[in-house]
Amino acid sequence: MKTMTGIITDIHRDVDDVVNLLENAQIIGVWQNHSEIGPRALGNRSIIFDPRMPEAKSLMNTVKKREWFRPFAGTILLEHVHDYFEMLQLKESPWMSFAVKAKPKALKEIPGIIHHDETCRIQTVTEEQNPNYYNLIKKFYEKTGCPVVFNTSFNLGGEALVETLEDAIDTCNRSDINHLYIPEDQEVNVPWHLLKEKYHIERAESD
């Protein structure tokens, strides 16, 4: 574990707070449920952002310290995927295993996750598969009309995916990720006052 820098990171438990932050172009780290294995982050150890912003890719490349040419991905509510992407015979893409062609609606509305060849590596999500992540995106859709979030793995270039809460905080503090979302139903075993004392963390309070 590398030394913490002492940069203040807000930890949010309320999904409405996170939706407001996304709408205001804030980068959010998501830490919940079991850890993730495999090549993709699927909403448990993810960094999310507003995909409507054309500069999203260049911004995230800077934040993650990774090569400019690598494509990014998105997570979309399953019930809306056919409005945005040519799925062909695919009914869903829960493991983010396929790059699919973007429809004109996607090119216009979510340019931040569309690669230069007009494809996107997309993850579909249902409430049954990941209730908290689905609920976050659904609330974002209800507020903005966009049923998609920019989704990339919660790590910096050349590093492993975060595992523990300390890993997540450390990654935030060594980057420009200033907000961490831990859903309200997730147990945090470290007392809040110790997080504040050790890592200079503030727990964001809902209005």
Q: Residue ranges of each PLM-predicted region?
A:
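Flexible beta->alpha loop and helix N-cap segments adjacent to enzyme active/binding sites
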Residues: 1-207
